[in-house]
Every structure is written in C-alpha cells, then in structure tokens.
Amino acid sequence: MKIERIEVFPVRLPMKAVLTLPRGPSRTLDEGKRIALVKMTDAEGNVGWGEAGPSRRWSAETLESCTTSIREYLAPALIGHDVFDIAGAHAKMNIELASGLDPGQPIAKGALDVALHDLLCKRLGIPLQAWLGAKRAGSVKLARLVSAGTPEEAARIAKQGLAEGFQGFKVKVGHHKEARDVELVRAVLEAAPGAYVWPDGNQGYTLEEAIRMARAFERMGVTLFEQPVPMTDVYAMKKLLSASSLTIALDEAAMGIPYVIELIRREAVESLAIKVSKVGGIHYARQMCDLALNAGLKLIGSGLMDAPIGFAASVHLFAAYGIDDPVDLNGPQFIAEDYLAKPFPVERQTACVPDAPGLGIQIDESKVKRFAL
C-alpha cells in the first residue's frame, strides 16, 4: 500500500474566454489554462490523478513553480509513503515546503493531495464523497460567472446563462467605478429575475468603498457580498460586518486554517468560500468546512477555473457538506477542451456526484500527450 511513482505532466488546455480580475485579465487566450497534472501510482498499479492549476494574478503560484515544487521536493518525499496516511503525507510535504498562515505552496500540495485521495478511494472501490463520510446531497448547482465591462454585456451573459439552465450568477466587481459596479449587478438582477445573484469584489475596495457598495447592493435585494476588501485588512473585514446586513463571504482570506481561526477569534468572519486547491487539497478543505460549520459560518463553494480533476474533487466535497447555493465552479465556461475520456455528468447546470470509485472520472492519456507543453 505504498506510493511507488509520481509523474508530472505540464499541459495547456485551450480556452474560449478569459476572466478579468481587479488586477487585470487572469491570463491570455494564447496562454490558455496551464496545468500540472499529477499521476500517482502505488505498488499494486492503482492510479490516482491530481492537478495544479494556478492563476498567477490571483495566487502566488505559477505553473513553473508548481511543477518544480512537485518534481524536486514534494513527490520525492512521498515515494514509499502509505497511501492511507493522508495526514502523514501532508506532514512530509510541510517539512519540504514550510506552511504558515496558508499551507505553503497549497496549489502544488493540493495536486498531490487530490491524487492521493483518488488513489486510495479507487483501492477501496468507493467514491470520494463516501470517504468524506457524508452524503448531504448528490449534486451541486453551478453558477454562471459574469465578468463584464458594461451593463449590456452583463445582461447578455445573464440571459444566455438562464437559457443554458443557470439559476445562480456571480458578478465580478471591484475593478470599475462604483456606479458602474452597481449598474452591472442591477443588470444581472433584471435580466435573471428570481436567480441567486451575488457580487465578488476580489479585494478591490477600500473599507469606505465597500460600505457604500454593500448598502447599494442591499437596496437591490442582494444578500451576499464576496471578499470586498483586502484579505490582510482584518479591521475592515470586521467593520464591514457591523456596517451591513449583507452576509460577507471571505474567499482570498480563507487561505488556511490558522488564519481562519484568527478571524473567528476576532469576530471578523461570518461566511467562507471554500476552494479545494487554495487550501492545499481535500484534507485541509474538509477541515475548514468542519471548522466553519462548528463555528456557525455559512459555506459557499468556489474554484480556480478548475479543469475536470479539480472540478470533480470540488463537487464531491461540496455535495458531502450540502452546499445548496449555486457554486462558482466555472472551468467549463472558459476551458474549450479537456483531457477526459467522457464528459463530467452535468444536467441543466447541476453537477452530479459520480458513482464510480475515486473522483469518478477517466483520464484520456492520449489527450494529456496532445495538450503537453
């Protein structure tokens, strides 16, 4: 039951659109979605897959850093390790690359974590959700991401999303003038009446701006505002909670369990956006979910424009914890082609938890070779 081999395959997946953040476009179409795929094999020939898909303008990791970290430091530390000792695997990885307020190179470590979970669940013949020990739901609803420069474009995206079956819309704000951000959210609300709509500031506002925006969104009937202020500004996060009736969800600030514990102690958090790759994989993501639920915090689901491996891992986790609001797993909106042998099961923008062992997906290794960098 030992890990025998770990291989890393840097790939580029073609994209059909790019996402704009307050710092600018997350990548270019030519750059594509660049991923370090991880194939983990045990002594009996069982295989698990993971992926590191960093967004260099969102996180501190890149494809190059993930590939080097895995090949040179993390993978060698795990060769010969017991596949059922996940905590021990993270302890070894944290010795090689130190953790702090976050797990330290969490996207790279998360790729190995997901591969390890996929492998051990395949050995057991159970889906990942069964390993997590809860089946609060068998599916999760997907949200349509709206990244638009004008209200007209935002309305068009929302109407198209409704026609495709989406009932939730996350609107990117924080990189326009305040009045334009209000117009963008209003346009989506009007174009998609009855849908669940929330703005995501991606840390783009000062405290004073965030308070004004929160009050404007309140008047429109919005109920949740995601990461309006910088993740390091604990004072602003706490102040905003008392200044607004909106639920303030923290995304970038939910980077690791030690920091979240400190935010809870300071009464500066009431909701967390869970990203599997952001926190170092399933092992830490499930701990963060348990911590949040025990502290009375609301959970929302999100991702990093995940390709199918990250998408599947997130669906298993979010369904296990019963996240019922639409989740921002937007990889399929942006990635034109992937490496799966057959598509992930999605019906009317609801992602269903696969019944097959592990992540429940099959990797087409001929496609991995075709997309290789």
Show which residues each predicted segment covers:
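Hydrophobic faces of well-ordered beta-strands that scaffold small-molecule active sites
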Residues: 50, 140-146, 169-171, 197-201, ...
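Metal- or metallocofactor-binding catalytic centers and their adjacent structured scaffolds
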Residues: 41-123
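Shared catalytic-loop signature of beta/alpha-barrel
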Residues: 215, 221, 232-247, 254-350
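Predominant activation on well-ordered alpha-helical scaffold segments within soluble catalytic domains
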Residues: 71-75, 109, 113, 117-118, ...
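Flexible C-terminal active-site loop/helix
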Residues: 2-18, 30, 35, 305-373
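Metal-dependent enolase-superfamily TIM-barrel catalytic cores that perform enediolate-based chemistry
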Residues: 130-244
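N-terminal basic, low-complexity leaders that serve as flexible interaction/assembly modules and, when applicable
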Residues: 1-68, 72, 371-372
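Conserved, mostly hydrophobic/aromatic
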Residues: 3, 38, 45, 74, ...
